[in-house]
Amino acid sequence: LNGKLVFAGMGIVLGATAWAAEFQVEVRVNVQRGCQLVGQERGAGVEQLGVLDFGSGPRLDGPEGALGAALPATRRPRLECNPDTPYQLRVDGGQHGGVGEVRYLAGAAEHSKPIAYRLYQDAARRIPLPVDVPVSGRVPSSGSVDLPLYGRIEPLAEIPRVSRYSDLLKVTVTW
């Protein structure tokens, strides 16, 4: 009987042997170039970047010089991308045509003449944004680029008719 218990005990010890195996798991992510436009209201259809508002006044020939407008700094659109991503910004001629560096605001009143205006890339209004000419750049290491638009109406020789003058631009950003 002692022999049977010893043999049975050895079976329990031999049956409790554990086997082990080691495996590897590769972990990875592929970061691709991409961008997203932030800082503007979201809605259905075409996104709205903001309003270039030249304000109100009876004349456009005042002693203070040209009228200026800029997208509001509180909501200025910005392109966020992987660093070193190339991008282009293009602004069309608007609803009322535009040639070279000049675009036009059209009045709602009958017989109102269009008012010429120009767009610029900088607050000093020295670097123009010509009609349908792409402006190229590269995203800096910060991964963020402001997309400012500045406008200017030069003093007019004629007093314009009373009206609300407006234009609608299409801004295309590609990367």
Predicted regions and their residues:
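N-terminal small/polar-rich segments of proteins
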Residues: A20-Y104, A109, G137-W175
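Sec-dependent N-terminal signal peptides
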Residues: F7-M10, L119, D167
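Bacterial N-terminal signal peptides that target proteins for export
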Residues: L1-F7
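Extracellular/luminal ectodomains and secreted, surface-exposed scaffolds of diverse proteins
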Residues: K113-R118, L129
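Short beta-strand and strand-turn-strand segments in soluble, beta-rich domains
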Residues: R125-D132
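Solvent-exposed strand-loop boundary residues in beta-sheet-rich modules
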Residues: A123-R125, W175
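N-terminal signal peptide c-region/cleavage motif recognized by signal peptidases
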Residues: G15-A18
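Predominantly extracellular/luminal cell-surface or secreted proteins
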Residues: D92-G94, R118-D122
